[in-house]
Swiss-Prot record:
It catalyses: uridine + H2O = D-ribose + uracil. The lineage of its organism: Eukaryota, Viridiplantae, Streptophyta, Embryophyta, Tracheophyta. Its main location: cytoplasm. Keywords: Cytoplasm, Glycosidase, Hydrolase. It comes from the Eukaryota. GO terms for biological process: purine nucleoside catabolic process. This is Probable uridine nucleosidase 2. It is an enzyme of class 3 (hydrolase). CDD domains: nuc_hydro_CaPnhB. Involved in pyrimidine breakdown. The keyword Lipid metabolism does not apply. One of its GO terms (molecular function) is purine nucleosidase activity.
Amino acid sequence: MDLQEAAMEARNGHRIPPTEEKVIIDTDPGIDDSVAIMMAFEAPGVKVVGLTTIFGNCTTSHATRNALILCDRAGRPEVPVAEGSAEPLKGGKPHVADFVHGSDGLGNTSFPDPTTTNKVEQSAAEFLVDKVSESPGEISVLALGPLTNIALAMKKDSSFASKVKRIVVLGGAFFAAGNATPSAEANIHSDPEAADIVFTSGADIYVVGLNITTQVYFTDKDMLELRNSKGKHAQFLCDICKFYRDWHVHSYGVDALFLHDPVSFTALVHPEYFTFKKGVVRVETQGICKGHTSMDMGLKKWNSDNPWTGYSPISVAWTVDVPKVLAYAKELLFNAQ
């Protein structure tokens, strides 16, 4: 095996990106966000350029505090954190899933404030625009919460969609039930106007919806293995996951927890573990189906224009290799040094 081939092989056979994957994580941490962020900090070949925060699993102010806690605990206090919008594009009180993630977003664990931080003065949208403009075509965005900050970046800079390398979105429910309402997934439901702007922007977008993420979960046995592992984040993650796991038992009747955000991070680094279908996606912005993601798969030729006409297709995750995604998550979490 030559050096180039060796660079393609990570521990346990997981491919390392042949070129460094630079990513800004737009996030509402959040318990499963925290798991994904710790994975990103540990992943070979991945450089976290910064974290931008948004409401969703908790308020934006709590999301910022939690992002700083995560950077501190990961030994990465130099990573910049930019605070994002406190409300959706249209204004109003944001949806906050404290019943899933606790009042603090970290399972009511009451961790102390970090001692060393790098919270920047820029807003999340300003940070996104500046970093992507500095390195056009090189920086991806992993969007783990409502898409408000991304939409604001696109409004601020009309060329943002063409300069960002790709945007991987945790959001939507494609031919599957929602989790905020029967028709809508939480991130999209929390700011449907922002989601529609992003999905129709022309950027290179990959969407990972509930139809994929609910196939991948850690059982109680997996969590026990994590707690007993030598991973440096294991105890912290197990502590915050208890609240999240108990909510799954109550809401879904399963002794497990879905890995929505870790799956989406894996789709960024290992898209080969998924298959995707392309189509134009629009978002319903009002009524009882607010937040519903509707995809034109191009299966027929329409006789006249419709609201999907003229927009660029995006890539929607269609299938997932569950064992490979689980193995990748365990590799990063169980062996973090």
